[in-house]
Design a protein with these regions (language model features):
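Conserved G1/Walker A P-loop phosphate-binding module
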Residues: 1-83
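Canonical P-loop GTPase G-domain recognition
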Residues: 3-15, 146-199
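Short, glycine/charged-enriched secondary-structure capping and boundary segments
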Residues: 22-23, 43, 86-89, 124-128, ...
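Hydrophobic aliphatic residues
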Residues: 43-47, 100, 163, 189
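Conserved nucleotide-binding/hydrolysis micro-motifs of P-loop NTPases
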Residues: 58, 71, 78-81, 116-118, ...
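Conserved nucleotide-sensing/catalytic segment adjacent to the nucleotide-binding pocket
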Residues: 69-106
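Conserved C-terminal guanine-recognition region of P-loop GTPase G domains, centered on the G4
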Residues: 97-169
Length: 199
């Protein structure tokens, strides 16, 4: 997809603060420091649309962006950072679950994992949420440039087993550095957005 515009719309915490649901939404979810912002920036060809941070747990809001005035990208707060309080962890969980439960314009969740790390309990909880609410999702394994091809194949298989990913479920390897997987992700998004809105 040719990107002609990419704009930050607003940040929100709870459903009453969300922007109007006038466009199909693609949400980006994953643990802290997994590379969500870098993935969004690479997909739209902008360096600083989604703010990146070396401090895990910094993003504590739901950030909405409009792409080409046709799609909304939603950057969900990262989870699983050990140094935040239990109350903050609880708020993050409630914030993300409220979005997944309430947002009828949500078309797909990009479920992001670091290919070098095994799925955490929080990752498994997110998967369970998505399954419970019957939300379509795509696994994207980031930082693929950090491993050799053989290591990538091995780690991908291990992650699939840990997630109990069914045969045929899409898993795309991605690198912000090399842009590996960028076109594959866009192909999935374009195919998905031709489908009717989730009921």
């Amino acid at each position: 997809m040719k990107i002609t515009s990419a704009e930050f719309i607003k940040s929100a915490v709870w459903p009453p603060q969300y922007p109007p649901a006038t466009l199909p939404e693609i949400a980006f979810a994953g643990r802290s420091n997994v590379g969500k912002s870098s993935l969004i920036n690479t997909l739209v060809g902008r360096k600083n649309l989604a703010k990146t941070s070396n401090t895990p747990g910094r993003t504590q809001l739901i950030n909405f962006f409009t792409i080409n005035e046709k799609i909304s990208f939603v950057d969900l707060p990262g989870y699983g950072f050990a140094k935040v309080s239990q109350s903050v962890k609880k708020n993050w969980g409630e914030m993300v679950e409220a979005y997944l439960k309430e947002r009828q314009s949500l078309a797909l969740v990009i479920f992001i994992l670091d290919i070098r790390r095994d799925p955490s309990k929080d990752d498994l909880s997110l998967r369970d949420w998505l399954e419970h609410y019957r939300i379509p999702y795509l696994y994207v394994l980031t930082k693929a440039d950090k491993l050799s091809n053989n290591q990538s194949v091995s780690q991908r298989s291990k992650i699939e087993r840990n997630l109990h990913a069914e045969a045929g479920r899409g898993i795309i390897l991605f690198s912000a550095k090399t842009e590996k997987g960028k076109n594959d992700i866009w192909q999935v998004l374009e195919d998905r957005l031709r489908l009717p809105e989730r009921k």
